[in-house]
Swiss-Prot record:
Gene Ontology CC terms: HslUV protease complex
One GO term (biological process): proteolysis involved in protein catabolic process
PROSITE patterns, A to Z: CLPX_ZB
Keywords on record: ATP-binding, Chaperone, Metal-binding, Nucleotide-binding, Zinc
Similarity field: Belongs to the ClpX chaperone family.
Gene transcribed to yield this protein: clpX
Subunit structure: Component of the ClpX-ClpP complex. Forms a hexameric ring that, in the presence of ATP, binds to fourteen ClpP subunits assembled into a disk-like structure with a central cavity, resembling the structure of eukaryotic proteasomes.
Pfam families hit by this protein: AAA_2, ClpB_D2-small, zf-C4_ClpX
Domain spans labelled ClpX-type ZB: 3-56
Binding, Zn(2+): C15, C18, C37, C40
Function: ATP-dependent specificity component of the Clp protease. It directs the protease to specific substrates. Can perform chaperone functions in the absence of ClpP.
Name of the molecule in the record: ATP-dependent Clp protease ATP-binding subunit ClpX
Amino acids binding ATP: P120, T121, G122, S123, G124, K125, T126, L127
């Protein structure tokens, strides 16, 4: 029986499952001639969650790409950086596996592994993060660390990062909590000096402190549909412990910090180790030896480094890698411009000597892969300006002389007479 008479006209209700009376529980929910208390509802939820957790990895395992598959996808879009790809593939796989199985596995709490990418300008840090988000079909947003300031100061609050992520998925909190956030220029928020100052460092150490809880995992309160916060407003609650944070930076000068640590203790005077200029380590070799203490010396606070346990270093791109970037990836620059010209019904051809010249120019500018587009854009500017007004052009050829500025691109016409007239 789920109800008993307490006295004349009084009914005492009991839970049909555990037998507790309505006075022993917080809430008793009525059904057709049955009752269930809040404690039994919670117990049922726990049982269902546990069963789903046991089934989920087996059911969803095939949907999550393996580290080998993630690496293969990155290879399609990013040239080189083999070590960084492997580190990212494992870290991303473990992160999403942790989300699918719950934060605990067999009673062991699984920690969060955010990622720090260290590499020179134009080495592919941003592209790697974008490609990962596209493969996993999760919301992705980028933030510039140089625009962030502590709360209460002019500039962007760190919680604006989560707001941008929510905007990417139409304010769907569940989707946002599975997203990826890439924070660029993270090296620019390093401490300005080792010495304490009477002036507040609101865009350096202050921002690192503000980012700590966000990166580690907290419940961020974000205004719905953007706008400023005010006391009467209801906020969206976003659990950042499920969001993967990838921080990247060029860390100019870090190689000198690493070198100082490496040579420390080698002796002085006659006992000192003498190194020739040719024996000096390259930027890539120096970055490969990076230790947490080097990042602390550079200006990142120990707590912040602790929240980024996975460190991947990217190498400088040489001329051969830049040539590969121009023609090999699925969305290679030459393929993009060829597709653009194809919309005009014109074939675009880059000769090998032209690709070599573009790569050499980018190397001279020290802009890495990022500088390739500006070079190609400048070379093709006049052609793209004139082409829509010209009739009968079937092909445009770019060679080394065009890149050097010694001649204009060669235009081949369908009609030989038009070709002859254009050559005059």
């Amino acid at each position: 029986m789920t109800e008993k008479r307490k006295g004349e006209g009084d009914k005492l209700l009991y839970c049909s499952f555990c037998g507790k009376s309505q006075h022993e529980v917080r809430k008793l929910i009525a059904g057709p001639s049955v009752y269930i208390c809040d404690e039994c509802v919670e117990l049922c939820n726990d049982i269902i969650r546990e069963e789903i957790r046991e089934i989920s990895p087996k059911r969803d395992g095939s949907e999550l790409p393996t580290p080998h598959e993630i690496r293969a996808h990155l290879d399609d879009y990013v040239i080189g950086q083999e070590y960084a790809k492997k580190v990212l593939a494992v870290a991303v796989y473990n992160h999403y596996k942790r989300l699918r199985s719950g934060s605990e596995s067999g009673g062991v709490e699984l920690g969060k592994s955010n990622i720090l990418l260290i590499g020179p300008t134009g080495s592919g840090k941003t592209l790697l993060a974008e490609t990962l988000a596209r493969l996993l079909d999760v919301p992705f947003t980028m933030a510039d660390a140089t625009t962030l300031t502590e709360a209460g100061y002019v500039g962007e609050d760190v919680e604006n990062i989560i707001q941008k992520l929510l905007q990417k998925c139409d304010y769907d909190v569940e989707k946002a909590q599975r997203g990826i956030v890439y924070i660029d220029e993270i090296d620019k928020i390093s401490r300005k000096s080792d010495n304490p100052s009477i002036t507040r460092d609101v865009s350096g150490e202050g921002v690192q402190q503000a980012l700590l809880k966000l990166i580690e995992g907290t419940i961020a309160s974000v205004p719905p549909q953007g706008g400023r916060k005010h006391p009467q407003q209801e906020f969206l609650q976003v659990d950042t412990s499920k969001i993967l944070f990838i921080c990247g930076g060029a860390f100019a000068g870090l190689d000198k910090v690493i070198e100082q640590r490496s040579v420390k203790g080698t002796g002085i005077g006659f006992g000192a180790e003498v190194k020739s200029k040719s024996a000096k380590a390259t930027l890539s070799e120096s970055f490969a030896k990076v230790e947490p203490e080097d990042l602390i010396k550079y200006g990142l606070i120990p707590e912040f480094i602790g929240r980024l346990p996975v460190v991947a270093t990217l190498t400088e791109l040489d001329e051969a890698a830049l040539i590969q970037i121009l023609k090999e990836p699925k969305n290679a620059l030459t393929k993009q411009y060829a597709a653009l010209f194809d919309l005009e019904g014109v074939e675009l051809e880059f000769r090998d000597d032209a690709l070599n010249a573009i790569a050499r120019k980018a190397m001279e500018r020290k802009t890495g892969a990022r500088g390739l587009r500006s070079i190609v854009e400048a070379v093709l500017l006049d052609t793209m300006y004139d082409l829509p007004s010209l009739d009968g052009v079937s092909k445009v050829v770019i060679d080394e002389t065009v890149i050097k500025g010694d001649s204009a691109p060669l235009m081949i016409y369908e009609n030989p007479e038009t070709q002859a007239a254009a050559s005059e």
